[in-house]
Every structure is written in C-alpha cells, then in structure tokens.
C-alpha cells in the first residue's frame, strides 16, 4: 500500500 493509504484490517 501507499503511505497513509494502508487499510486498518
């Protein structure tokens, strides 16, 4: 994922 774009799950 990208910085600040990663899913919480």
Curated annotation (Swiss-Prot):
- Which stretches are transmembrane? none
Q: In which tissues is it expressed?
A: Expressed by the venom duct.
Post-translation changes: It is unsure whether Ser-9 is amidated or not, it is why the two forms have been synthesized. The non-amidated form shows a very weak agonist activity on the zebrafish vasopressin receptor 1Ab (V1a1R) (EC(50)=117 uM). The state of the C-terminal residue does not impact its 3D-structure.
Q: Which UniProt keywords apply?
A: Amidation, Disulfide bond, G-protein coupled receptor impairing toxin, Secreted, Toxin
Task: Enumerate the residues marked as the site Aromatic residue important for selectivity towards vasopressin receptors.
Answer: 3
Site for Non-basic residue surely responsible of very weak activity, residues: 8
Main localization category: secreted
Provide the positions where the record notes the PTM Serine amide: 9
- S-S bridge residues: 1-6
Single annotated GO MF: toxin activity
Using the record, list the residue span of the signal peptide; answer none if the entry has no such feature. Answer: none
State where the protein is found.
Secreted
A Gene Ontology term for the protein's cellular component: extracellular region
Q: What is known of its domains?
A: The cysteine framework is C-C.
| Job description of the protein | Shows reduced activity on vasopressin-oxytocin related receptors. Is more active on fish receptors, than on their human counterpart, supporting an evolved role of this conopressin in the envenomation process. Shows weak agonist activity on the zebrafish vasopressin receptor 1Ab (V1a1R) (EC(50)=13.6 uM). Also has weaker agonist activity on the human vasopressin receptor AVPR1B (EC(50)=38.2 uM). Has no effect on all other receptors tested.
Give the similarity note.
Belongs to the vasopressin/oxytocin family.
Identify this protein by name: Conopressin-M1
The source organism is: Conus miliaris
Species lineage, top-down? Answer: Eukaryota, Metazoa, Spiralia, Lophotrochozoa, Mollusca
């Amino acid at each position: 994922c990208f910085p600040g774009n990663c899913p919480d799950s």
